[in-house]
Amino acid sequence: MLIKLLTKVFGSRNDRTLRRMRKVVNIINAMEPEMEKLSDEELKGKTAEFRARLEKGEVLENLIPEAFAVVREASKRVFGMRHFDVQLLGGMVLNERCIAEMRTGEGKTLTATLPAYLNALTGKGVHVVTVNDYLAQRDAENNRPLFEFLGLTVGINLPGMPAPAKREAYAADITYGTNNEYGFDYLRDNMAFSPEERVQRKLHYALVDEVDSILIDEARTPLIISGPAEDSSEMYKRVNKIIPHLIRQEKEDSETFQGEGHFSVDEKSRQVNLTERGLVLIEELLVKEGIMDEGESLYSPANIMLMHHVTAALRAHALFTRDVDYIVKDGEVIIVDEHTGRTMQGRRWSDGLHQAVEAKEGVQIQNENQTLASITFQNYFRLYEKLAGMTGTADTEAFEFSSIYKLDTVVVPTNRPMIRKDLPDLVYMTEAEKIQAIIEDIKERTAKGQPVLVGTISIEKSELVSNELTKAGIKHNVLNAKFHANEAAIVAQAGYPAAVTIATNMAGRGTDIVLGGSWQAEVAALENPTVEQIEKIKADWQVRHDAVLEAGGLHIIGTERHESRRIDNQLRGRSGRQGDAGSSRFYLSMEDALMRIFASDRVSGMMRKLGMKPGEAIEHPWVTKAIANAQRKVESRNFDIRKQLLEYDDVANDQRRAIYSQRNELLDVSDVSETINSIREDVFKATIDAYIPPQSLEEMWDIPGLQERLKNDFDLDLPIAEWLDKEPELHEETLRERILAQSIEVYQRKEEVVGAEMMRHFEKGVMLQTLDSLWKEHLAAMDYLRQGIHLRGYAQKDPKQEYKRESFSMFAAMLESLKYEVISTLSKVQVRMPEEVEELEQQRRMEAERLAQMQQLSHQDDDSAAAAALAAQTGERKVGRNDPCPCGSGKKYKQCHGRLQ
């Protein structure tokens, strides 16, 4: 009560921010007549003038009024569009490292030109981040004339572009691209073998469009580049045959997992657990199939991988539904994004889940992948010096933006008042009753010429509504993951009188729905239209536009509440753009997923008390409140998951930054001989200490063991025993010095053969390859540690602290291994002629190019939240790293010729 009173007196923080910024808007407006007097050349010359002022030490913020006034005037001349005052406010919010909440249709794309221009003046580059390639290309091409008029360069960063084209795109003043592509380029740059292979500059300013989708919805999905691991597709097929014999348990006794069924499903956490009966049955079936030996337990250490296959197969059958979570197209399982309803070509679930779904659907099973490099969006975007974003719905997630990204949210007012009518929810007992009510509402609305947009949460639901509309004889368009090639065109015409469009979630986001349809799309469909044709199309559109406004504007129907209020608000936000008329209503049933999981008992009890009859709906503030509470529960749970993922990833992030920093230093120097000499001393000291403990008696020395170790690991055949026999006075310290001196001498002889320059080149290559190899193994070890660390909680230990402690120990051990393996490899390698070294380098480059061409980046999403992976196939290897080396040495390939690949 007191807070509300204070807010009334002093205004909210949002009000105070906007009040401060409106003073600057007044200054910009006062400059408008002065800007109008400038010629095109004088206006273009302002960019060079601003840059000169910045070089002399002027602060960027001081340029805001004049720079924004220049962009507004340039926009008037190039596009014939003038930035509204609210767009100037939005531009200032975005420059202040904030999230700007701007309603749909308020011109976010044009608003973004203001801070993009201002921050591009520094010459450090601006990255405009969009949710898909179509929007990146559209926005770049639409805004290119404006930026080029002002003397700035524009680049587009798309998947599959060759490195030189990417480098050129990143060198531009303003670069447009998707969040995935920026993240993957960062990871690829940190896997490069020479400075020339890198494409990104230092990360300066990121302007994220649809920021809620990228920084929140996708925050649980780490970007991962991975290569193929061993083939286990046959095992997935064999285990898949067993699963249909298991029966799902309806009521789970979480304490004992006892009951009639064989497995229980927890829909909240998206997990499946075997019951005791299920464990007995599955062990019998595994023995019968010859997969497991009689008398063995599925939980024994020897069967860990088998348990992994069983769990993945159970989840595939019990939790993942065709045409809801994925579709099958051209013999491939393609994931459907739960947030947008779009298909995500190439994206793959991790932990063997995708392979299990492929086995379930009977399509070809692709190999599992091994992580080569990874980063979460949370940690990638925090690498930028300056981060800002815009969306139509951010206020509900303001706390998360603030706590994780340190970004304040500012709600920017609309240019015209919002007059859309948001009608109360209607709740029915069954889904069939709900669908029937939706059909009746659509009939009523279209009869008076009102366009309707129906939002569904899955392809399955969109097809269900579509079938019912077809039966009722209502013409409609379906926009879902199966047919989104012409997405923008369908969305653009969704405002046509009496048009009915069914869209999964927020498919088509980024394209405005214009009342009366898009006259521009009609003009674009004609070949060489005349002025008369264009005028007629415009006149026809105006008649349609007025008719739709008269009918009540665009009506939004939500067929279910989403887990997040923000997604519901996004659907509603498609109507009522720029002060247009509109309305919205959500239809719910007690069979909806959200109601069933979170609100069913309380609300259904309430409905029974009210004596509900079939076909009747309940419309009451209590019900609306119960639904809002259910959504808050889910949002809170999802926030906790994302926060927990970040806390764990922060540990890996510190290590990642250390490794990538070290790696970049290595790439940028040509001579690492000093580092090698320092490492050699450390390695030989540690090796000798293991056999000749410091300050120990000679009887405690293991000379045969030391000789064997030096021979096997460093190719040093030293007669240490003879030295000690011939020189009894030879003490420990002198012996250490002699062994080290011998190793240096042998190494110098190698250097004389190939030349110092070649040896420096080779040393650098070995260090980089060894670092990459060990880092890859370390990532896998960290992943295993992360998966089981929660069990430490049963021993009254804090899993996060345990994870930090153990991962640090593993990291320290990896650095020691790095030193040892670098010196071991350099000591054992036999190089005879400079030509051989050159040939080796040529082979490595050709192989790197081949792998780069074969690389298919794919983004995975795992509902279990903590670990998902974005896989990049990097080609098949003929010899596995742990296979015997083909040279016949008897050693593992990775410890022999694999070093030189």
From Swiss-Prot:
An example Gene Ontology biological process: protein import
Basic residues biased stretches: 891-901
Annotated binding of ATP, by residue: 87, 105-109, 512
Positions bound to Zn(2+): 885, 887, 896-897
Keyword line: ATP-binding, Cell inner membrane, Cell membrane, Cytoplasm, Membrane, Metal-binding, Nucleotide-binding, Protein transport, Translocase, Translocation, Transport, Zinc
GO molecular function, one term: protein-exporting ATPase activity
Membrane association type: Peripheral membrane protein
GO cellular component: cell envelope Sec protein transport complex; cytosol; plasma membrane
PROSITE patterns hit by this protein: SECA (PS01312), SECA_MOTOR_DEAD (PS51196)
Subunit structure: Monomer and homodimer. Part of the essential Sec protein translocation apparatus which comprises SecA, SecYEG and auxiliary proteins SecDF-YajC and YidC.
Record-given protein name: Protein translocase subunit SecA
